[in-house]
């Protein structure tokens, strides 16, 4: 069969995002794969979160509706990937078999298509599954059913499309319980995606403090570990409306003193030690500071954290694109040049 005929069959049979002609390893069924998690991690080396859009109860409810031009802007700014927070639990039935709305899958398909059209990589996650955090035992079956559907739906997607099992487990989903749930979710994903890169995070809000309590399944060759970083919290979240008492922190600066830098280094060294012990790459899946902070401090902190991550071969994703922590103002069509220069310094 000619290459042209095979391409036409691919276009007719599956979505555009599943027909990449990029080079790479292939499985027996012809699917391109990336089986080295360090190689996959390099694809998301410099990423941005598409926050406040698809993880809202409904897209647009938190002020962000994704547009095709956003992906073009992200690519042109120098980013290599996006992290896509998604509240799947708001778009699936609450009774068995917990079916995900077809129209919502269509919307995520569109996102994946924009990602690949712009030669970006993406991490798709389950975000803000609040019911699971509050009642893990009652929600476990639904959680696994969501992943079975997501995994099967994207089993033919390009390997640049990665899965992240759950954003920031916390509350009743304890570290011990999370280790159990992530292993079971990973097993479900592997039924249809034996080679796809999967990202796993820490319990207790995804922070570095619980990395030592994270247990990854043995003999799992294609995992990336992710942590989030918002230290010092009173700086990054000063004036955040959803954080009680944060107005009292207004005016907190980050001056880049030796001790401030050392605190970042010490935190990241802890992650490096764990990752080296387990032989896994690291994805700094969220870091950012709220818009009410002093601009110069925001720039200094962002630059130092990004460079500290990069120097340790962490990939990173800034939180986030165009909302309260954002890099881009959709009303003016302008980037926050100070933050962009912090992430992509000239020297």
Enumerate the predicted regions with their spans.
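Bacterial N-terminal signal peptides that target proteins for export
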Residues: 1-7
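C-terminal motif of bacterial Sec signal peptides marking the signal peptidase cleavage site
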Residues: 17-18
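N-terminal carbohydrate-binding accessory modules
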Residues: 21-83, 98-99, 272-274, 342
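Acidic/histidine-rich helix-loop elements
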Residues: 50-66, 90-101, 234-263
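An active-site-proximal structural segment forming one wall of the substrate-binding cleft
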Residues: 64, 71-80, 97-128, 132-162, ...
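Active-site region of glycoside hydrolase catalytic domains
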Residues: 144-259, 265-290, 311-314
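Aromatic-rich peripheral "rim/lid" segments of glycoside hydrolase catalytic domains that contact
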Residues: 294-347
């Amino acid at each position: 069969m000619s290459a042209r005929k095979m391409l036409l069959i691919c276009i007719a049979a599956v979505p555009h995002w599943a027909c990449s002609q990029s080079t790479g390893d292939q499985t027996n069924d012809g699917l391109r794969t990336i089986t080295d998690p360090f190689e996959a991690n390099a694809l998301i080396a410099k990423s941005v979160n598409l926050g406040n859009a698809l993880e809202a109860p409904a897209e647009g409810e938190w002020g962000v509706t994704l547009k095709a031009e956003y992906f073009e802007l992200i690519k042109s700014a120098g980013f290599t990937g996006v992290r896509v927070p998604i509240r799947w639990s708001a778009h699936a039935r609450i009774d068995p078999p917990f079916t995900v709305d077809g129209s919502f899958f269509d919307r995520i398909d569109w996102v994946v298509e924009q990602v690949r059209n712009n030669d970006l990589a993406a991490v798709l996650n389950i975000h803000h599954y609040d019911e699971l955090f509050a009642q893990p035992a009652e929600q476990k079956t639904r959680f696994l059913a969501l992943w079975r559907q997501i995994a099967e739906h994207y089993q033919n997607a390009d390997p640049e499309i990665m899965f992240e099992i759950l954003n920031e487990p916390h509350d009743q989903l304890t570290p011990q319980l999370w280790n159990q749930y992530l292993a079971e979710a990973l097993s479900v994903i592997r039924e249809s995606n034996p080679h796809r890169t999967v990202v796993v995070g820490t319990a207790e809000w995804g922070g570095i403090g619980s990395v030592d309590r994270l247990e990854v399944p043995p003999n799992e060759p294609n995992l990336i570990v992710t942590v989030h970083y918002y230290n010092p919290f009173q700086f990054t979240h000063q004036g955040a409306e959803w954080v009680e008492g944060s107005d009292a922190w207004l005016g907190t600066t980050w001056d880049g003193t030796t001790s401030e830098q050392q605190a970042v280094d010490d935190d990241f060294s802890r992650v490096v030690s764990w990752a080296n012990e387990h032989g896994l790459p690291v994805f700094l899946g969220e870091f950012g500071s709220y818009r009410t902070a002093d601009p110069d401090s925001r720039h200094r902190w962002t630059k130092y954290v990004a460079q500290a991550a990069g120097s340790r071969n962490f990939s990173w994703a800034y939180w986030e694109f165009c909302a309260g922590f954002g890099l881009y103002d959709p009303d003016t069509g302008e980037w926050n040049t100070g933050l962009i220069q912090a992430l992509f310094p000239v020297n």
